[in-house]
Amino acid sequence: MEEGLLEIMTKDGGDMPAPLEVSTVPAVGDVISGEYNGGMKELMEHLKAQLQALFEDVRAMRGALDEQASHIQVLSDDVCANQRAIVSMCQIMTTAPRQGGLGVVGNKGNFPGARRDPETPSPGIGDSGLLGRDPEDEEDDDEEEKEMPSSATPTSHCELPESPCAGLLGGDGPLVEPLDLPDITLLQLEGEASL
């Protein structure tokens, strides 16, 4: 039928009809896919920026940790050095000879740096005292010392001081008068009889 109409129109000398313009409406799938692709692209760029910032933070934290580790290593080296020094000092102190004993023996009981006062002779002990006294006076003094007992002689350890209660215990009668108490045996017999 269309071919017939075209033939009639051509025979009459009419012009060919212009083709109908069809509006290009995008398909729903194309719209959805475009929006999806655009959203995913933006999301990927955002995630990429966040990951980059995270990597930068991790790199900074690693540098700080390395610095702290080096500082800790220095401190541990110092501690080890101090410990070795203390151990060596203890060994030296324990193995070193004691010099104080030698000083005491050399100075007859005095410390090495102590001053010694010059010994002054007591009066009467020197040569002048012995020469100035008469031998007869010395014999008289010896006799007087023998006759007079020395008050500074210590008493024997068996001689105990008199007790303050010695007079009371050495008296004629008892200290306390006996009370009139019933005999215990009589009380026991009376108790058995009552049973």
Swiss-Prot record:
The keyword Coiled coil applies. Signal peptide: none annotated. One of its GO terms (cellular component) is cytoplasm. It comes from the Eukaryota. Transmembrane segments: none annotated. Pfam families: DUF4677. InterPro entries: DUF4677. Keywords: Coiled coil. Residues 39-68 form a coiled coil. Residues 135-146 have a biased composition (Acidic residues). Residues 98-175 are annotated as: Disordered. PANTHER family: COILED-COIL DOMAIN-CONTAINING PROTEIN 184 (PTHR31554:SF2). This is Coiled-coil domain-containing protein 184. It comes from Bos taurus. The gene is CCDC184.
